[in-house]
Protein backbone atom coordinates (compact mmCIF):
# COMPACT_ATOMS: atom_id res chain seq x y z
CA UNK A 1 0.00 0.00 0.00
CA UNK A 2 2.94 2.32 0.59
CA UNK A 3 3.97 1.89 -3.06
CA UNK A 4 0.57 3.14 -4.25
CA UNK A 5 1.33 6.55 -2.69
CA UNK A 6 -2.31 7.31 -2.02
CA UNK A 7 -1.38 10.24 0.20
CA UNK A 8 0.15 12.01 -2.80
CA UNK A 9 -3.00 11.68 -4.94
CA UNK A 10 -5.25 14.70 -5.43
CA UNK A 11 -8.42 12.65 -4.95
CA UNK A 12 -10.08 12.73 -1.54
CA UNK A 13 -11.75 15.13 0.87
CA UNK A 14 -10.17 18.13 2.54
CA UNK A 15 -10.40 18.56 6.31
CA UNK A 16 -8.63 21.56 7.86
CA UNK A 17 -6.76 22.00 4.58
CA UNK A 18 -5.37 18.44 4.58
CA UNK A 19 -6.30 16.00 1.85
CA UNK A 20 -7.50 12.64 3.22
CA UNK A 21 -8.34 9.78 0.87
CA UNK A 22 -7.57 6.56 2.75
CA UNK A 23 -7.65 4.86 6.14
CA UNK A 24 -5.43 1.78 6.47
CA UNK A 25 -5.29 -0.80 9.22
CA UNK A 26 -3.69 -4.24 8.72
CA UNK A 27 -5.64 -5.85 5.86
CA UNK A 28 -8.50 -3.32 5.92
CA UNK A 29 -8.25 -0.33 3.58
CA UNK A 30 -10.92 2.34 3.21
CA UNK A 31 -10.77 4.80 0.31
CA UNK A 32 -12.48 8.19 0.70
CA UNK A 33 -13.30 10.29 -2.38
CA UNK A 34 -15.78 12.88 -3.58
CA UNK A 35 -16.69 11.49 -7.01
CA UNK A 36 -17.04 8.32 -9.02
CA UNK A 37 -14.06 9.23 -11.19
CA UNK A 38 -11.76 9.71 -8.18
CA UNK A 39 -12.83 6.35 -6.77
CA UNK A 40 -12.04 4.60 -10.04
CA UNK A 41 -8.62 6.27 -10.20
CA UNK A 42 -7.63 5.19 -6.67
CA UNK A 43 -9.01 1.68 -7.09
CA UNK A 44 -7.04 1.13 -10.30
CA UNK A 45 -3.86 2.29 -8.55
CA UNK A 46 -4.44 -0.17 -5.72
CA UNK A 47 -5.29 -2.95 -8.18
CA UNK A 48 -2.19 -2.38 -10.34
CA UNK A 49 0.23 -2.20 -7.39
CA UNK A 50 -1.32 -5.30 -5.84
CA UNK A 51 -0.82 -7.30 -9.03
CA UNK A 52 2.89 -6.36 -9.08
CA UNK A 53 3.45 -8.31 -5.85
CA UNK A 54 1.15 -11.19 -6.73
CA UNK A 55 -1.97 -9.96 -4.93
CA UNK A 56 -5.44 -9.71 -6.43
CA UNK A 57 -8.14 -7.21 -5.56
CA UNK A 58 -11.15 -9.24 -4.39
CA UNK A 59 -14.16 -7.50 -5.92
CA UNK A 60 -16.59 -9.67 -3.92
CA UNK A 61 -15.16 -8.33 -0.65
CA UNK A 62 -14.88 -4.75 -1.92
CA UNK A 63 -17.93 -2.62 -1.08
CA UNK A 64 -18.96 0.93 -1.98
CA UNK A 65 -20.79 3.25 0.39
CA UNK A 66 -22.07 6.52 -1.00
CA UNK A 67 -24.32 9.37 0.05
CA UNK A 68 -25.67 9.65 -3.51
CA UNK A 69 -28.02 7.36 -5.44
CA UNK A 70 -25.41 5.06 -7.01
CA UNK A 71 -26.81 1.51 -6.87
CA UNK A 72 -24.07 -0.42 -8.67
CA UNK A 73 -20.70 0.19 -10.23
CA UNK A 74 -18.35 -1.87 -12.37
CA UNK A 75 -14.57 -2.13 -12.52
CA UNK A 76 -12.98 -4.22 -15.27
CA UNK A 77 -16.39 -5.70 -16.05
CA UNK A 78 -17.04 -6.85 -12.47
CA UNK A 79 -19.91 -5.37 -10.48
CA UNK A 80 -19.14 -3.97 -7.03
CA UNK A 81 -21.80 -4.10 -4.33
CA UNK A 82 -23.17 -0.85 -2.90
CA UNK A 83 -23.96 -0.87 0.82
CA UNK A 84 -25.50 1.58 3.30
CA UNK A 85 -22.97 0.76 6.02
CA UNK A 86 -19.92 -1.33 6.86
CA UNK A 87 -17.88 -2.40 9.87
CA UNK A 88 -14.42 -0.94 10.44
CA UNK A 89 -12.37 -1.85 13.53
CA UNK A 90 -15.45 -3.09 15.37
CA UNK A 91 -17.60 -0.01 14.72
CA UNK A 92 -20.41 0.39 12.22
CA UNK A 93 -20.04 3.29 9.79
CA UNK A 94 -23.19 4.29 7.90
CA UNK A 95 -23.85 6.54 4.94
CA UNK A 96 -25.90 9.00 6.98
CA UNK A 97 -23.14 9.38 9.59
CA UNK A 98 -25.56 8.67 12.45
CA UNK A 99 -24.04 6.99 15.52
CA UNK A 100 -27.39 5.61 16.70
CA UNK A 101 -26.94 2.52 14.49
CA UNK A 102 -23.72 1.67 16.32
CA UNK A 103 -25.05 2.47 19.80
CA UNK A 104 -28.15 0.31 19.27
CA UNK A 105 -25.94 -2.51 18.04
CA UNK A 106 -23.73 -2.32 21.13
CA UNK A 107 -26.78 -2.31 23.40
CA UNK A 108 -28.00 -5.51 21.74
CA UNK A 109 -24.54 -7.05 22.12
CA UNK A 110 -24.60 -6.05 25.78
CA UNK A 111 -27.95 -7.76 26.36
CA UNK A 112 -26.63 -10.88 24.67
CA UNK A 113 -23.51 -10.85 26.85
CA UNK A 114 -25.66 -10.37 29.96
CA UNK A 115 -27.75 -13.45 29.20
CA UNK A 116 -24.57 -15.51 28.75
CA UNK A 117 -23.50 -14.55 32.27
CA UNK A 118 -26.78 -15.74 33.81
CA UNK A 119 -25.33 -18.93 35.26
CA UNK A 120 -22.61 -16.94 37.03
CA UNK A 121 -24.73 -14.00 38.15
CA UNK A 122 -27.46 -16.25 39.56
CA UNK A 123 -25.01 -18.30 41.60
CA UNK A 124 -25.48 -17.96 45.35
CA UNK A 125 -21.82 -18.85 45.95
CA UNK A 126 -20.67 -15.49 44.54
CA UNK A 127 -21.10 -12.32 46.57
CA UNK A 128 -22.99 -9.31 45.23
CA UNK A 129 -19.91 -7.00 45.10
CA UNK A 130 -18.09 -9.64 43.02
CA UNK A 131 -21.04 -9.90 40.63
CA UNK A 132 -21.10 -6.11 40.22
CA UNK A 133 -17.37 -6.14 39.42
CA UNK A 134 -17.95 -8.90 36.85
CA UNK A 135 -20.66 -6.85 35.12
CA UNK A 136 -18.42 -3.79 34.99
CA UNK A 137 -15.40 -5.77 33.78
CA UNK A 138 -17.04 -8.13 31.27
CA UNK A 139 -20.26 -6.42 30.20
CA UNK A 140 -19.80 -2.65 30.21
CA UNK A 141 -16.75 -2.75 27.86
CA UNK A 142 -18.99 -4.41 25.26
CA UNK A 143 -21.35 -1.42 25.37
CA UNK A 144 -18.69 1.30 25.57
CA UNK A 145 -16.35 0.01 22.85
CA UNK A 146 -15.66 2.92 20.51
CA UNK A 147 -17.87 5.31 22.53
CA UNK A 148 -15.13 7.98 22.50
CA UNK A 149 -16.07 8.90 18.93
CA UNK A 150 -19.85 8.71 19.33
CA UNK A 151 -22.10 11.74 19.06
CA UNK A 152 -24.67 10.76 21.67
CA UNK A 153 -28.09 12.42 21.74
CA UNK A 154 -30.64 12.44 24.55
CA UNK A 155 -32.37 9.36 23.19
CA UNK A 156 -29.15 7.34 23.36
CA UNK A 157 -28.50 8.58 26.91
CA UNK A 158 -31.92 7.30 28.00
CA UNK A 159 -31.33 3.94 26.32
CA UNK A 160 -27.99 3.41 28.05
CA UNK A 161 -29.53 4.35 31.40
CA UNK A 162 -32.39 1.92 30.78
CA UNK A 163 -29.92 -0.81 29.82
CA UNK A 164 -27.87 -0.29 32.98
CA UNK A 165 -30.93 -0.55 35.24
CA UNK A 166 -32.04 -3.62 33.30
CA UNK A 167 -28.67 -5.20 34.16
CA UNK A 168 -28.91 -4.31 37.85
CA UNK A 169 -32.52 -5.51 38.15
CA UNK A 170 -31.59 -8.76 36.44
CA UNK A 171 -28.60 -9.12 38.76
CA UNK A 172 -30.78 -8.59 41.84
CA UNK A 173 -33.56 -10.80 40.40
CA UNK A 174 -36.05 -7.97 40.48
CA UNK A 175 -38.82 -8.61 37.90
CA UNK A 176 -39.92 -5.78 35.67
CA UNK A 177 -43.38 -5.98 37.23
CA UNK A 178 -41.97 -5.12 40.68
CA UNK A 179 -42.58 -1.49 41.58
CA UNK A 180 -39.10 -0.59 42.77
CA UNK A 181 -37.60 2.76 41.90
CA UNK A 182 -34.04 3.13 40.69
CA UNK A 183 -32.67 4.73 43.87
CA UNK A 184 -33.08 1.67 46.16
CA UNK A 185 -31.53 -0.50 43.46
CA UNK A 186 -28.51 1.81 43.16
CA UNK A 187 -28.07 1.83 46.94
CA UNK A 188 -28.07 -1.95 46.99
CA UNK A 189 -25.62 -2.18 44.09
CA UNK A 190 -23.38 0.56 45.53
CA UNK A 191 -22.05 1.53 42.13
CA UNK A 192 -19.71 4.51 42.27
CA UNK A 193 -20.04 5.42 38.58
CA UNK A 194 -22.91 4.78 36.18
CA UNK A 195 -22.52 3.40 32.66
CA UNK A 196 -23.34 6.81 31.21
CA UNK A 197 -20.78 8.43 33.52
CA UNK A 198 -18.15 5.95 32.36
CA UNK A 199 -18.87 6.79 28.72
CA UNK A 200 -18.72 10.54 29.34
CA UNK A 201 -15.45 10.12 31.22
CA UNK A 202 -13.94 8.19 28.30
CA UNK A 203 -15.10 10.86 25.84
CA UNK A 204 -13.57 13.68 27.90
CA UNK A 205 -10.29 11.81 28.31
CA UNK A 206 -10.15 11.13 24.57
CA UNK A 207 -10.85 14.80 23.83
CA UNK A 208 -7.94 15.84 26.03
CA UNK A 209 -5.71 13.24 24.39
CA UNK A 210 -6.56 14.61 20.94
CA UNK A 211 -6.11 18.27 21.80
CA UNK A 212 -2.78 17.71 23.57
CA UNK A 213 -1.30 15.98 20.52
CA UNK A 214 0.36 17.69 17.58
CA UNK A 215 -1.26 17.76 14.14
CA UNK A 216 -2.25 14.07 14.14
CA UNK A 217 -4.78 12.52 11.78
CA UNK A 218 -7.19 11.81 14.65
CA UNK A 219 -7.09 15.42 15.79
CA UNK A 220 -7.73 16.72 12.27
CA UNK A 221 -10.66 14.34 11.74
CA UNK A 222 -12.32 15.21 15.06
CA UNK A 223 -11.61 18.93 15.29
CA UNK A 224 -10.92 20.06 11.72
CA UNK A 225 -13.38 21.92 9.52
CA UNK A 226 -14.67 20.21 6.39
CA UNK A 227 -14.88 22.21 3.18
CA UNK A 228 -18.37 22.79 1.82
CA UNK A 229 -21.76 23.75 3.21
CA UNK A 230 -23.99 22.10 5.74
CA UNK A 231 -27.52 21.23 4.68
CA UNK A 232 -30.47 23.54 5.25
CA UNK A 233 -32.70 23.25 8.27
CA UNK A 234 -31.87 22.24 11.80
CA UNK A 235 -28.27 21.13 12.02
CA UNK A 236 -27.33 17.78 13.50
CA UNK A 237 -25.37 17.66 16.71
CA UNK A 238 -21.60 17.39 16.21
CA UNK A 239 -19.11 15.47 18.34
CA UNK A 240 -17.47 18.67 19.55
CA UNK A 241 -20.87 20.14 20.46
CA UNK A 242 -21.40 17.29 22.90
CA UNK A 243 -18.00 17.88 24.51
CA UNK A 244 -18.48 21.62 25.03
CA UNK A 245 -22.02 21.07 26.35
CA UNK A 246 -20.79 18.38 28.75
CA UNK A 247 -18.09 20.50 30.39
CA UNK A 248 -20.12 23.71 30.00
CA UNK A 249 -17.42 25.87 28.43
CA UNK A 250 -16.57 27.35 25.04
CA UNK A 251 -14.07 25.81 22.64
CA UNK A 252 -11.54 28.62 23.22
CA UNK A 253 -11.74 28.08 26.98
CA UNK A 254 -11.36 24.35 26.42
CA UNK A 255 -8.12 24.91 24.49
CA UNK A 256 -6.72 26.90 27.41
CA UNK A 257 -7.68 24.30 30.03
CA UNK A 258 -6.19 21.39 28.06
CA UNK A 259 -2.76 23.07 28.03
CA UNK A 260 -2.64 22.83 31.84
CA UNK A 261 -2.64 19.17 32.85
CA UNK A 262 -3.70 19.66 36.47
CA UNK A 263 -6.61 21.89 35.47
CA UNK A 264 -7.68 19.40 32.80
CA UNK A 265 -7.48 16.46 35.23
CA UNK A 266 -9.72 18.43 37.58
CA UNK A 267 -12.29 18.86 34.78
CA UNK A 268 -12.19 15.13 33.96
CA UNK A 269 -12.55 14.22 37.63
CA UNK A 270 -15.47 16.63 38.01
CA UNK A 271 -17.32 15.10 35.06
CA UNK A 272 -16.76 11.55 36.34
CA UNK A 273 -17.90 12.50 39.84
CA UNK A 274 -21.06 14.23 38.64
Predicted features by range, described:
Residues 1-274:
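Short linear motifs embedded in intrinsically disordered, charge-biased segments
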Amino acid sequence: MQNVRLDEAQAGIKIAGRNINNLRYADDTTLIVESKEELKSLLMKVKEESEKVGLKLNILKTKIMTSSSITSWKIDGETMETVRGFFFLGSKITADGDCSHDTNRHLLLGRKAMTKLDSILKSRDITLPTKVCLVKAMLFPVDTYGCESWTIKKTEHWRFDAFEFWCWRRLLRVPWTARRSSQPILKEIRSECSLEGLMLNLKIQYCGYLMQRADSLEKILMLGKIEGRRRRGRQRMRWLDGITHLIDMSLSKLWEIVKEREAWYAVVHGVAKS
